[in-house]
Amino acid sequence: MTYIVGLTGGIGSGKTTIANLFTDLGVPLVDADVVAREVVAKDSPLLSKIVEHFGAQILTEQGELNRAALRERVFNHDEDKLWLNNLLHPAIRERMKQKLAEQTAPYTLFVVPLLIENKLTALCDRILVVDVSPQTQLARSSQRDNNNFEQIQRIMNSQVSQQERLKWADDVINNDSELAQNLPHLQQKVLELHQFYLQQAENKNA
């Protein structure tokens, strides 16, 4: 059975950058964001239930889910948010477990932004946190997504704190520096962790 390394970090931490460095080494990924999009794909049963609940205004002209419109709709409405989470989380969790079970590589990177918040840590053998300061989160996210600071702050407030996330970490990659300056260091750190995880996987399956 594949050894599972959970990769997590707050908004703007650079999880995708780190995940890509692992894939460059041939490590397979199971990405929660990809799974979350798959379960509400166009014409899917779950998307039909969401439209039934919220109305067709949460769809794009192509009939796909408008994630920004849905996010805005539920963010300040706790009942709607609870309804949506109760619908989606079990389906996403089952799909992720299925994908993890299908992996045959020595270890798999399980990329989940809300790994701790959604209580998915039990699916992991080890947890890797990409750590940045709250100031870096705000600066990066506002540049990347053209979100205003208030929206980003709301998202950050809905996630666990930096301190809480670090309590769960078995391994930490600090990603505060600019990528252009920091890339060689990140590549070296990922290579070291890759070799360590291969050894851990071998020990688990011995």
Curated annotation (Swiss-Prot):
UniProt key word Disulfide bond: no
Keywords (A to Z) from UniProt: ATP-binding, Coenzyme A biosynthesis, Cytoplasm, Kinase, Nucleotide-binding, Transferase
Protein EC: 2.7.1.24
GO molecular function: ATP binding; dephospho-CoA kinase activity
Main localization category: cytoplasm
Cellular compartments annotated: Cytoplasm
Record-annotated DPCK domain positions: 4-204
InterPro entries: Depp_CoAkinase (IPR001977), P-loop_NTPase (IPR027417)
CDD domains: DPCK
PROSITE patterns: DPCK (PS51219)
Catalytic activity line of the entry: 3'-dephospho-CoA + ATP = ADP + CoA + H(+)
Function of the molecule: Catalyzes the phosphorylation of the 3'-hydroxyl group of dephosphocoenzyme A to form coenzyme A.
HAMAP family listed in its UniProt record: Dephospho_CoA_kinase
Family statement: Belongs to the CoaE family.
Protein name: Dephospho-CoA kinase
Recorded name of the encoding gene: coaE
